[in-house]
Amino acid sequence: EITERLVGSEMCIRDRSAVITLGATRSAIDDVRHVQNTSSGATGWSLAGHLYKHGHDVTCVAGLTTSAAPEWLPLVLTCPTPDSMLKECLAIANDGIDAWIHAAAVLDYVVEAPAEGKLASQQGTLNLALVESPKHIMELQKACKDAVRIGFKLESGVKQADLIHRAYAQIQKAGMSAVIANRLEDMSDRSKPRGYLVDRHGAHFVLADTEALNTAIQTLIERSGEM
């Protein structure tokens, strides 16, 4: 891995500092139960490894993952909840990071009032009040305004044109540099592209596979001075 990194770094215009959020997040129901969304973290780990091997300074802010992290990544911070992940990102933003890639699956809704201890079993229906969780890309907008910012947008049951439109709307609302958009129903279909890169001008580009995704993000980061 070290040899690959040295070779890759020679191709960089300048090594960039990049933060990648990845994995799933959870919200406590009580001390032993949680509401959690689904994300293996595989895309984030793959991207982190790709950027690191090309000479960039990579920090991973990881939620819960089922895909193993490359052992040679230098800095992995574990943040299993939306709140802890946001706090960590806000702290890191003080270091003047060059690029942010928001690949984590952050819960849109969290439990309003987690119970202390363990709720008793077999007590009939359990009703949970869920409240909206802060959008990380919005909360970090001011702190990261001078950085390359790339988000991920997952939708389901929408046409490709609508998917692209929603990704572009996210770029405009949150001040992103680009968004990687894909549909849930396409994720397990190998005949479908890995996703679409939508830029700040509304143009979109097909990403055939994960390698194409990694290379596209690398290019955006390395050309940041030209944007």
Positions of PLM-derived features:
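Glycine/Thr-rich phosphate-binding loops of Rossmann-like dinucleotide-binding domains
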Residues: 28-30, 109-111, 189
